[in-house]
C-alpha cells in the first residue's frame, strides 16, 4: 500500500483539530435558551459571553502567531487545542453566568488563537503549489465542525434543562485526547528562512523577529486592507452563528435541535460549494491574473450581502433556509481565497505572526457583534439586527476593491521556494 505523503497526513490531523475548534465555538448558540433557563441570564449577558470570547481571542492571537514563528508551530497547535478543550470541558460544570464568562470566554478564548496561525502557516508551507486548495480543504473542517456540533448541541438541548452541559463535556474530553494524538504524530516542521536574514551566523532575537513580522504585514497596505475586510466578515460570522439558532426557534417555532442544525446546515452546504469552486479558480488563474484572489473574495462579500438581508426578512422558513444557502455560497467563495491572498502579499517566514496580527484586527472588531445583536433584539428585533450584517459585508467589499487596486505582482511572495 502506498505510504501517505506527510503533507496530506498533516492536513488530516489539523483538519480534525479545526473541526473541534470550530465545533466547540458553535455549540454555544444553539444552547442559549437552555443555558438561560438553567443558570438565569439576560439576552445581553448571553451575548456578552460570546463577546468576551471574541475579544480575548483577538487580543491573544498576535502573540500566538509571534510565538509560533519564534518557537514551534507544532507545539502551539498542541498546547492551544489542550487549553481551549479544557475550557470547554469545565464550561459543562458552571452554575452561573460569571463562571461561563471565565471558562468559555477567557480560557477557551485564550486557547483557541494558538491553533489557527500555526496550522495555516504549516499548510501554506507544506502545500506551496496548491495553497488555496489545501487551505480550502482545511476550511471544510470548520464547516463540518460547525454543522455537526450545532446539531449535536441542539439535540442535547432538547433533552431537558440540564442537557446543554453534555456537548461541552463530550467535546472537551475528545479534544484533550486529540491534543495527545497531535503531540505524538505532527512533525516539528521548521519555517522557511527570510529572504534577507539579519545575521546568517546567529538566530534573530525576539525583538528583531517581532519588528520584522510587524513590518512584513503593515508595510503592505493590501495586507492591512485584507485584515480590515476580514473584520467585517468576522463581525457577520460571530453574530450570525451566535444568534441564528435562537432566531429560527423563536421566529418559525421549530425545535431546538432543528434550529441548531438548520441555522448552519444550509449556510455551510452552500459555503462548501463556494469554497471548492473558488479555490480551484484562484489556484489556476493567479499566475495569469495576480489580483484574481482579490476579485474572488471581494465578489463573495458583495454578492453575499443581499442574501443576508433576505435571510433577515424572510417570512417563511423555506425562504430563510434558501437565503442562508446562497449567503453561504458567496461566503465560501470569500473563504476559499482569503488567506491565500493574504499569504501572497506577506513574506513566508512571517506567515504565522502576520496571520496573528490579521486575525487580531478582525476579531477585535467582530467581538462587538453578539452583544450588539443581543441589545438590538431586546430593543427592536433580531430581524433588524441580522439585516444590519449585510452592511458589514458591503464595507468589506469596498476595502477589498481598494486592496486590489494597490496590490502589485512584485509583492507576490515566493512561496514555491519553501517546501
Write out the residue ranges for each language-model feature.
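Helix-loop junctions at membrane interfaces in 12-TM secondary transporters
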Residues: 92-103, 310-323
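Conserved MFS/SLC helix-loop-helix module at the cytosolic interface between two early adjacent transmembrane helices
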Residues: 59-97
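Primarily marks hydrophobic transmembrane alpha-helices of the MFS/SLC 12-helix fold
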Residues: 77, 291-297
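Helix-loop-helix hairpin linking two adjacent transmembrane segments in secondary transporters
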Residues: 138-188
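Extracytoplasmic gate region of multi-pass secondary transporters
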Residues: 28-29, 221-276, 335, 339
Amino acid at each position: 500500500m502506498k505510504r501517505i505523503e506527510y503533507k496530506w497526513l498533516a492536513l488530516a490531523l489539523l483538519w480534525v483539530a479545526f473541526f473541534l475548534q470550530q465545533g466547540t465555538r458553535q455549540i454555544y448558540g444553539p444552547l442559549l435558551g437552555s443555558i438561560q433557563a438553567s443558570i438565569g441570564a439576560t439576552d445581553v449577558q448571553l451575548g456578552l459571553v460570546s463577546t468576551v470570547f471574541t475579544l480575548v481571542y483577538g487580543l491573544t492571537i498576535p502573540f500566538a502567531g509571534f510565538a509560533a514563528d519564534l518557537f514551534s508551530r507544532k507545539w502551539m497547535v498542541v498546547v492551544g487545542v489542550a487549553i481551549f478543550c479544557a475550557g470547554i470541558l469545565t464550561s459543562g460544570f458552571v452554575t452561573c453566568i460569571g463562571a461561563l464568562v471565565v471558562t468559555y470566554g477567557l480560557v477557551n478564548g485564550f486557547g483557541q488563537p494558538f491553533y489557527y496561525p500555526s496550522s495555516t502557516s504549516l499548510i501554506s508551507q507544506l502545500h506551496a503549489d496548491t495553497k488555496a486548495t489545501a487551505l480550502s480543504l482545511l476550511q471544510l473542517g470548520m464547516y463540518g465542525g460547525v454543522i455537526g456540533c450545532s446539531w449535536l448541541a441542539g439535540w442535547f438541548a432538547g433533552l431537558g434543562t440540564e442537557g446543554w452541559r453534555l456537548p461541552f463535556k463530550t467535546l472537551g474530553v475528545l479534544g484533550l485526547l486529540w491534543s495527545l494524538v497531535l503531540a505524538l504524530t505532527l512533525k516539528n516542521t521548521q519555517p522557511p528562512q527570510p529572504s534577507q536574514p539579519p545575521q546568517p551566523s546567529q538566530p534573530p532575537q525576539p525583538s528583531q523577529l517581532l519588528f520584522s513580522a510587524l513590518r512584513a504585514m503593515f508595510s503592505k497596505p493590501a495586507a492591512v486592507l485584507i485584515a480590515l475586510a476580514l473584520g467585517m466578515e468576522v463581525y457577520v460570522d460571530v453574530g450570525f452563528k451566535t444568534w441564528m439558532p435562537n432566531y429560527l426557534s423563536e421566529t418559525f417555532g421549530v425545535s431546538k435541535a432543528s434550529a441548531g442544525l438548520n441555522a448552519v446546515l444550509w449556510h455551510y452546504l452552500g459555503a462548501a460549494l463556494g469554497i471548492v469552486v473558488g479555490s480551484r479558480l484562484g489556484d489556476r488563474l493567479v499566475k495569469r491574473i495576480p489580483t484574481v484572489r482579490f476579485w474572488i473574495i471581494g465578489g463573495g462579500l458583495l454578492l453575499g450581502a443581499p442574501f443576508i438581508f433576505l435571510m433577515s426578512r424572510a417570512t417563511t422558513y423555506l425562504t430563510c433556509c434558501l437565503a442562508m444557502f446562497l449567503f453561504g455560497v458567496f461566503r465560501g467563495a470569500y473563504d476559499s481565497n482569503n488567506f491565500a491572498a493574504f499569504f501572497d502579499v506577506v513574506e513566508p517566514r512571517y506567515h504565522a505572526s502576520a496571520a496573528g496580527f490579521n486575525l487580531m484586527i478582525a476579531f477585535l472588531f467582530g467581538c462587538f457583534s453578539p452583544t450588539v445583536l443581543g441589545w438590538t433584539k431586546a430593543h427592536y428585533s433580531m430581524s433588524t439586527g441580522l439585516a444590519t450584517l449585510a452592511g458589514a459585508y458591503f464595507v468589506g467589499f469596498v476595502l477589498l476593491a481598494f486592496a486590489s487596486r494597490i496590490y502589485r505582482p512584485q509583492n507576490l511572495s515566493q512561496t514555491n521556494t519553501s517546501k
